[in-house]
């Protein structure tokens, strides 16, 4: 398994997001004025909320964009909003060593409208071959499947969050994390995701309804 992380700061929307990528080789409505402060990209078997220390955040700043166009959740990132969105990439490897970039790179885009957060992911393969699929069930073991998971730190406390993910085979994974503990996978909501597989990569598209998550009232960050 090769794992890595990268940290980005996204401006203009919502709350902190934590992304997890694991690639195995060979009750309130959110308001548009709330600031989206930080995105951390990870590929590791825990959420690692404390990884921000010592990182130059300004170096990894990207902006989310609001769209008024209809986004078709089909696993094909061809709408104008996707084509012009900032891209988070260049993951830093942390397992088995933390001495360089991950050999399998990932591209992440985030856009939103009044009701939904959209996440677009392109996961490139570093070696050819069949992608590991241990299960097609919901809430699969993410250490045994190629997958991508996003954590929404809606309370901006690096301790609590909502998780949404998919495997390369298209299975969904979602849950709630409280007080920095393990993720409770009994929490399931209706959200949309589609995965497309290609010879050298797999692509995923998420649509996460804002009504399904909560945040601190009056939060500005």
Model regions and ranges:
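Bacterial Sec-dependent N-terminal signal peptides
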Residues: 5-56
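Structural preference for beta-rich elements and adjacent junctions enriched in aromatics
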Residues: 50-221
């Amino acid at each position: 398994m090769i794992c890595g992380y990268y940290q980005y700061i996204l401006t203009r929307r919502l709350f902190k997001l934590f992304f997890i990528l694991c690639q195995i080789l060979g009750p309130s409505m959110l308001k548009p004025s709330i600031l989206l402060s930080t995105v951390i990209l990870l590929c590791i078997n825990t959420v690692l909320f404390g990884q921000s220390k010592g990182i130059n955040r300004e170096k990894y700043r990207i902006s989310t964009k609001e769209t008024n166009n209809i986004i078709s959740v089909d696993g094909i990132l061809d709408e104008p909003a996707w084509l012009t969105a900032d891209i988070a990439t260049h993951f830093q490897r942390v397992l088995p060593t933390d001495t360089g970039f991950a050999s399998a790179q990932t591209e992440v885009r985030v856009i939103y409208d009044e009701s939904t957060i959209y996440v677009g992911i392109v996961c490139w393969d570093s070696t050819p071959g069949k992608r590991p699929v241990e299960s097609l069930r919901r809430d699969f073991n993410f250490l045994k499947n190629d997958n991508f998971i996003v954590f929404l730190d809606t309370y901006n406390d690096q301790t609590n969050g909502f998780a949404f993910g998919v495997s390369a085979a298209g299975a969904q994974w979602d849950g709630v994390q409280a007080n920095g503990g393990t993720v409770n996978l009994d929490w399931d909501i209706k959200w949309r995701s589609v995965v497309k597989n290609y010879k050298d990569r797999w692509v995923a598209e998420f649509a996460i309804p804002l009504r399904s998550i909560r945040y601190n009232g009056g939060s500005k960050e």
